[in-house]
């Protein structure tokens, strides 16, 4: 049973992203009105806007939370070619603002020459690290060496993807068996379309990221990409939002079967492909156990996908833009359905139209 709560977001333009914090009690939204808003959930379950400020001089494409171990920290990225890191400060006891909080900009990352289309904090076991991707086809990875000083970030890696980048996802696995890994999607729509998803892995010996795999079957523009939480699996699961929803498994090939020293090779299988949205899919998001995938698309619906014990993925629920379930939704979908959804109550936030995310 799903309960829908409509929120008057009060953004002055299209909302591109909605992000929940680790505990799910705080939410951040960003918009083409150049602002970010922070929302807090009250004991009664109502969401209240507790902060709103102009963050960039262009549309804000994405906003994301750091792990709370590092404090209340947000990152945002924009068409203005920058990414920014924000920290919430609580007024000191001798301050007129005692006990009141406000957000301060800790740094602006200005290395990109084009629109910065996504920003993601690395899994916390890697320390305080941040990845950005840009329309110029470069993924940049930054590190804050002193987590108490968020004004100092050093550019550690630049990864050239050869294609305009639209989205990134860190592999969340904290297993020592898995090297740090980042997946990159492209929404490049040029006719000489290459594969739109690349996966890069960190090599301890060279201290650089190297391309491990390319998903050759994904040739349509990719709008979102998400590794599932790992929870001890020996393989990885990757969801992709393109003209439909696709779920891939990546199973590492045993090291002795591959050339030593190079990046891990994977057996890649597509385990589900859903076109039930009958439209572009803009966002995919996993639950905390990596067992349920939510997708949203231009059909105005959020769809929920789950695998059964036979590893067949099914649609287990459909929510319309107003939050109401669609009749018979639990029967719909199979391992070849599709996905799509936007949520008017958050002004198409999950839809996140990428119009103009490139440099003009």
From Swiss-Prot:
Instruction: Enumerate the residue ranges of region (Disordered).
Output: 324-360
Q: Where in the cell is it found?
A: Chromosome, Centromere, Kinetochore; Nucleus, Nuclear pore complex; Lysosome membrane
What is the official name of this protein in its record?
Answer: Nucleoporin SEH1
Biological process per Gene Ontology, one example term: mRNA transport
Cite the PROSITE patterns for this sequence.
WD_REPEATS_2, WD_REPEATS_REGION
Q: Where is this cross-link: Glycyl lysine isopeptide (Lys-Gly) (interchain with G-Cter in SUMO2)?
A: 12
Quaternary structure (record): Component of the Nup107-160 subcomplex of the nuclear pore complex (NPC). The Nup107-160 subcomplex includes NUP160, NUP133, NUP107, NUP98, NUP85, NUP43, NUP37, SEH1 and SEC13. The SEH1 subunit appears to be only weakly associated with the Nup107-160 subcomplex. Component of the GATOR2 subcomplex, composed of MIOS, SEC13, SEH1L, WDR24 and WDR59. The GATOR2 complex interacts with CASTOR1 and CASTOR2; the interaction is negatively regulated by arginine. The GATOR2 complex interacts with SESN1, SESN2 and SESN3; the interaction is negatively regulated by amino acids.
Report biased composition (Low complexity) as residue ranges.
324-342
- Keyword flag Manganese: no
Recorded hits in InterPro entries, A to Z, give: G-protein_beta_WD-40_rep, Sec13/Seh1_fam, WD40/YVTN_repeat-like_dom_sf, WD40_repeat_dom_sf, WD40_rpt
| Acetylation as UniProt keyword | no
Q: Which UniProt keywords apply?
A: Cell cycle, Cell division, Centromere, Chromosome, Chromosome partition, Isopeptide bond, Kinetochore, Lysosome, Membrane, Mitosis, mRNA transport, Nuclear pore complex, Nucleus, Phosphoprotein, Protein transport, Repeat, Translocation, Transport, Ubl conjugation, WD repeat
| Regions of compositional bias (Polar residues) in chain numbering | 343-354
- Protein family according to the UniProt entry: Belongs to the WD repeat SEC13 family.
Q: What does this protein do?
A: Component of the Nup107-160 subcomplex of the nuclear pore complex (NPC). The Nup107-160 subcomplex is required for the assembly of a functional NPC. The Nup107-160 subcomplex is also required for normal kinetochore microtubule attachment, mitotic progression and chromosome segregation. This subunit plays a role in recruitment of the Nup107-160 subcomplex to the kinetochore. As a component of the GATOR2 complex, functions as an activator of the amino acid-sensing branch of the mTORC1 signaling pathway. The GATOR2 complex indirectly activates mTORC1 through the inhibition of the GATOR1 subcomplex. GATOR2 probably acts as an E3 ubiquitin-protein ligase toward GATOR1. In the presence of abundant amino acids, the GATOR2 complex mediates ubiquitination of the NPRL2 core component of the GATOR1 complex, leading to GATOR1 inactivation. In the absence of amino acids, GATOR2 is inhibited, activating the GATOR1 complex.
Spell out the Pfam families in the cross-references. WD40
Single Gene Ontology MF annotation: structural molecule activity
Q: How is its activity regulated?
A: The GATOR2 complex is negatively regulated by the upstream amino acid sensors CASTOR1 and SESN2, which sequester the GATOR2 complex in absence of amino acids. In the presence of abundant amino acids, GATOR2 is released from CASTOR1 and SESN2 and activated.
Q: Which residues get modified to Phosphoserine?
A: 190
